[in-house]
Amino acid sequence: MGVARSVRMRTKSLFAAALTVSLISATGCSDDSESDDPEDSIFVDDSKADDFYSMSAQEYLVEGKSTIVLDASFATKTVDERLREAKRIVGLKQIAIAWFMTQYLVDKEHDDPNASFGGFGGMAKAGAYEDLEIRERADKLTFDFVFRQTAAGGKNLMMSLPIRVAGGKQVFDLEIGKPSNAQMNELETNHEWYRSAPWSGWNPSTASADQKEKITFSIVKEKVSTDGFFDIARLTADGKLDMDVFFGWDYHSDYHLKHSKQFFTWLKEQGFRSPTTSWDTLTPTSGAFTKTVKADGRDVKLEVRIYFGKPGTTTDPDTDAGGKLLENIALESLKTRDVIMYSGHSGPFYGFAIANWKKTEEGDLDDADIRVAQMPADRYQVVLAEGCDTYQIGTAFKENPNKAGKNIDIITTTSFSDASSPAAVQQFVSALIARDSTGRLRPQPVSGLLTKLDGNSFSFQSLYGMHGIDDNPKLVPFAKSGNFGKTCGVNADCGGPGNLCVSAGTGQGKKCTAACASLGESGCGTGYTCKAVASQASSTIYGRACAKL
C-alpha cells in the first residue's frame, strides 16, 4: 500500500492482556471454549436485577448546513442540468465533511502532525450520508444543502466535545477544509485528495483562511441497537464452518509473524488438527486446521486457514508479487468463506493492509475494494476487522451490492486496537465455536465477545462494536421452542445447548425454555418475554431466558 499516511499504528498495550470474570460470565467463552449452562437456573424479577447493559461505543446523528458552488459554465445550463451537477458535487462534499469530522474526532498518536487537534475516540461513518434541502441561489451556481451523517464514539462523547446549545439543539463548531471541486473529484484508490497536505492530518490552526470554513454541527444520540446471537445455525447449515485469518504486515515487531505463529500453536491446543508439522512449513496452500464438533445433533466440520506475509516466500510482504497473492487470497475468502478475520494496521477511509505498504501498493483491501468485492448475496458471513479505527469498514461491507445491508456482521473499532497479542482473533474464534462440556456448539450473544475485546487493552479504550446486529437472532439458535412450558428436571430434558430448564420461583417447579439475548426483546414468541436468569447456588445473573408472561 503506497499511502502510509492513512494507515494508523496499532498500539501496544502497556500491560499484558487479561480476561476478567463478569456477572454475566456465561455470555462469554473461555479459551477452552466450554460453555455449560447452570442446572439451578431461576428467573429474576425485573425489580431485582441491576438495570445495566453496556457496550463501550455509541452512534450519533450529526447534522449541519453547507454550500457548494458550481463551475461558472453551468450558469447557462438548464435547471435540471444544474441540479444534477449540484447533487454530484454535494456527494463529494459529503465525503469531505466525513473526512474532516473524522480527523477531528479520531484519537491521535503523540507524533501525529495534528496530535493537538481534537482526539475524542470517534469517527464519521463514511458512506452513511443524507442530502437534505438542496436549494439553488439566485446566481444559479451556489447551492445550499443540509447534510446528515452518522458518527460513532464513546458513550461520553457528547460530554467531551465543546458542546453549546443553539436553537434548542446541542451543537459544536468545527473548521473543516475547503478543497476545490476539482480536488474533491480526485478519488482514485490510494491517491485520493485527502491523502495529501494540507488535508491529510488536518489541523485548521495551521491552515490559511481560504483553506477552511466553519460549520456548526448538531449532534444527538442514535437509537441504540440491542444484543443478539451470532447466527450459528446459518453458519453451520451446510455442515461446515470455514474461517480464514489474515495477519497484516507489522512494523512494530514483525507481529504478523509472531502472532500467526502463536495462533498456530493456539489452534493445536484447542484440538484442531494441523495441516502441517510446524509453523515454519506453513504455506498458503497448506490447507486448513480441522476439527469436528456437534451442532444441533449434527456433525459440523470446523476449518481454519492462516495467511500472512512471510519473507522470502510467495507471500513476501515486501514485494508486488507477494502482496498481490495475499490480496487475491483475501478477495477469494470474501467470496467463499463463512468467516473472514483481519488483524493488522488500518485507519480512517482505509481497510486491510496485508502487505508492506511502505514498499508495495499491492496487498491491500481498502474501503473502495470492499464495496465492490465479490461476496455471496444469499450467504450469511461474519467479518472481524481487528485494527485501529476500522469503524468505517462496517459501512463498506454493508454497502456491497451483494450484501445490501443483509447477511453480514462486521466487528470493528472506533479507536486504537492492541497490537501486542493475537488475543482478539482467539477470542473471536472462541466465541464462534463455544461449546459445552460434551463438545456441542453453544451459540453466544455478541455482547460477551465485545466485552472481552474491550478488556484487552488497559492503557486505552478500543471501543469495539458490531455492524449488522439488528437482524441477528434474539432467541438462541437451535432453540426448541416447541418444548417451552414443559415440565423438566435438567437442561437436557429441553433440548441441546442453549435450551434451559428454569424455575419460575419457589414452589412453581421447573419448565423448559431457551436463552435469549435482550431483555424484553421479541424472539421468544407470543406469550413470552426475555428475562434475566440466575444460578441459585451462586446467586449471580449469568444470562437471559424466555419467561412466560
Name every feature range the model reports, one short phrase each.
Residues 3-16:
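Bacterial N-terminal signal peptides that target proteins for export
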Residues 23-42:
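Bacterial Sec-dependent N-terminal signal peptides
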Residues 39-146:
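Long, solvent-exposed N-terminal ectodomains/accessory regions
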Residues 114, 120-289, 333:
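Non-catalytic propeptide/linker segments at domain boundaries
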Residues 252, 265-334, 455-462:
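Functional beta-strand-loop-alpha-helix junction segments that form "active/interaction loops"
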Residues 317-410:
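Cysteine protease catalytic core and zymogen-processing segment of caspase-like enzymes
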Residues 381-481:
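Active-site-proximal C-terminal subdomain of hydrolase catalytic domains
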Residues 480-549:
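Secreted, cysteine-rich disulfide-bonded mini-domains of extracellular proteins
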